[in-house]
C-alpha cells in the first residue's frame, strides 16, 4: 500500500513539475539558435548584440562625461595629459588600431579582446568608486557616473560572455587579462600626484570604453547584418 | 684704443639690429594649432593659424609623434587640407593613440614652434554634411500626399561595415517663416513630410552626427515649391464636426438628465404588475374589508341569473356508517367555466369526503381557477373571509368518516362555490349506499325526534330521487325504499331490504337530485335529474328546502309547499302510512 501511494505521489509530483515547466516556459522570448545547449539560450543573438551595443555605448558616454567633468575641475593648466601617455594598464592587449586592422581581425579574437578589456576593468572601477567617494569635495556628477559605470560594466561582461558562448561554442575563456596596479597612486597623499593618477585612470577608461564600443558595433554589423548596416 | 674698438663694434651691432627692426624682419611668431578633425574616423586633418611672420617669408612645418613612440614625423600632406593644414591619410592615422602635434614657423630670423596639441582621433570626429539631398512631391492614390526627402551618407564614412555609426537631422520651413521644423532620424536616409501648406516654397536642410562626436555642418539649402492645388487634409472641418457632435451629445445628456425617468419608461416600459380591477389597496391598508369587498362585488360578479340556469348540481345523498347526510356533488356537470373537482376517496367510507385536506384546499383555491372577474387572487386568507361569498368552511377535520364537512355556501347565491361535480370515473365502485332511501334511514337513526320532519324529508327525498327512474320499477323500488326508510326502529331489518331489493338500484348509477338553484336564504332548490335514457319527459320541478343543518352536519330538508307535485306525493303516501308505526 505504501509503495502504491508513494508512486502515485511521485507521478503526481512529476506531472506537476511538467505542467509548471510548460507554464513557465510560456514567457520565454523568441526562438533561440542554440548550439550550446539549453543553458543560456533564452535570448536570440540579435537581441543580445542589440543590448550589448546599447550598454557599451552608454558606458562610453558616461566615461566621456566623467573625464570632461574631472578635467574641467581638477586638471586645468596642470599638464596632466603629458603624464597620461602610455599609462593605461591595458596597453599590453593587442587591440587593432584602425579600421583595416579591425576588419582583418577575426571575430573570435575581437570578442576575446573585448572580454579581456571588460574583465581587466572590474577591479579598477571598484577602487575608482571607493576613492572618488573619499575625494575631498568630489562632485556628485563624477561619483554617480563612476558608480553607474561599475554596474554597467558588470552587466556588459555578462552579456558578452553569453554572446561568446553562442558565437563560439565550446571555446574556453581562459585568456589572461591585464591586471591593474595603480591603486597606490590613487591613494597617495600628494594631491597633485593623486589627481594625476585619477586623470590617467579616467583617460584610460574613456579610451577602453571606446574600443569596446567600436568593436561591438563592428561585430554587430558583421555577424548580425552581414556587413550591411 | 682697444676700448674704442669694442664700443664701436657694439654700436655697429646695435645699429644693425635697429635697422633690421625698422625693416620688420623678425623670427616668426608662434603659430597656433586650431583644430584637428576626422571626417570618418579613418583620416584626419589639422589646421593651424600662423602668427606674425616677422616680415620675412616663413615656412610652416608640422611635426608630430605618436604616443608610445619616440620618432618624430613630419606632416605627410600639406596640400589636401588647404593652406595651413596637414592631412593625415589612412596610412598615417591610428585610432586610440595620442598624437602630439607641433607646428613650426621658420623664417630667416628664427623658428617658432607652437604649443603641442594632444590629439586622439577618436574624439575629433566630425563628419561632412549628408550628400545628395533630393526633394520630391508624391501623390499616391488613396493616401495623403507628402514630401519625400532623400539623402545619402556623407563622404568618407563607412556605415555599412559598422565602423561609423551615424544619425541625421532634417529641418524645413516655409521660405518666409522664421522657425524651423526639425526631424530626427536615427539611421534611415529618407523622410516623409505631411501636412504641407500649398502654394508655399519650402527650404530644407540636413546634418548628421556620429555616435560619439560632433555635429556636421548644415547642408546647403534645398528648396521646393508646393503647388497651389496640392491637396491637404483640412483639419478645420473635422474640428467643426467634432465640436458639433460634442454639442449634440451634451444636449442629449442634458435632456436625459432632465426627463430621465420618463424617457426611460418610454423606452423600457415597466413590467405591469398584477392588478385587481376595483381593488383599492388603500382600503385594504385601512382594514375596511367590507368596503373593499363591496367594491369587488360591484364588478359584475358573481354571475347573474344566467349562471343560475347553468348551475346544475347534483347532491348525492346517501347513508353511510357514520349516519350522516352528506351532500354530494353530482357526477355530471360542467358549468360554464367551472372546472370539475377531484374528490379524494377515503378509505373508510369509500366516498370522496369533503373534509379531506387536499380537497378542502382545492376548493379553497378554486376561485382562483375560476375564470372570474377577479384579476388576481389575493391569497388564500382572503378566500376565507366569510364576507366575500367565497368560503370554504373550515370544519374540524377528523380522520374517520365522521365529521365530514358539508360543503355549502354561507350566504349568497354564489354558484361558483358549490362543489363541482366530479367525473364519474372517479367514483368508487365501492359505493354500497347510493340512494336517498338509505340515507334516510341513517337520518332516521340519527335524529329520532325529528322523525316527522324526516318523514317528510324522506318523502321529498324520495321524490327527488325518484325522478331518476320514470319507470314503475323505479317507483316500486322507491316505495320499498321509503318503506324501509320509515320504519325507524327496524333498522336492522331495514338495512338488508334495500339491499335485497335494490339489485336494480345497485346496478343503476347513483340517484341524484339536481340543485336547481340556491336562493338568498340558503334554500336549496332541487329538482329531479333528467334521465335521458328513459326518455324521461319529466319536466316537473320539485324543490326541497334546507331547513337547517344539525350539529352533526346533517342537512335537514323540508318540503317546499309551493312546488309540490301531488302525483308524486300520492303514491308513497299511500304506502308509507302502513309502514309507519
Swiss-Prot record, chain A:
Q: Which Gene3D superfamilies would you find in this protein's record?
A: 1.20.1250.10
Which SUPFAM superfamilies does the record match to this protein? 4-helical cytokines
Give me the disulphide-bonded residues: 34-41, 88-204, 221-229
Matching PROSITE patterns, A to Z? SOMATOTROPIN_1, SOMATOTROPIN_2
**Does the keyword Ligase belong to this entry?**
no
Record-level GO cellular component terms: cytosol; endoplasmic reticulum lumen; endoplasmic reticulum membrane; extracellular space
Name the source's superkingdom.
Answer: Eukaryota
Single GO BP term: positive regulation of fatty acid biosynthetic process
Q: Where in the cell is it found?
A: Secreted
Look up the signal peptide feature and give its range: 1-30
Q: Name one GO molecular function term.
A: prolactin receptor binding
Residues with the Phosphoserine modification: 56, 64, 120
Keywords from the UniProt entry? Disulfide bond, Hormone, Lactation, Phosphoprotein, Secreted, Signal
Subunit arrangement?
Interacts with PRLR.
What family is reported? Answer: Belongs to the somatotropin/prolactin family.
Its biological purpose is as follows: Prolactin acts primarily on the mammary gland by promoting lactation.
Q: What is this protein's record name?
A: Prolactin
| Annotated source species | Bos taurus
Give the gene symbol.
PRL
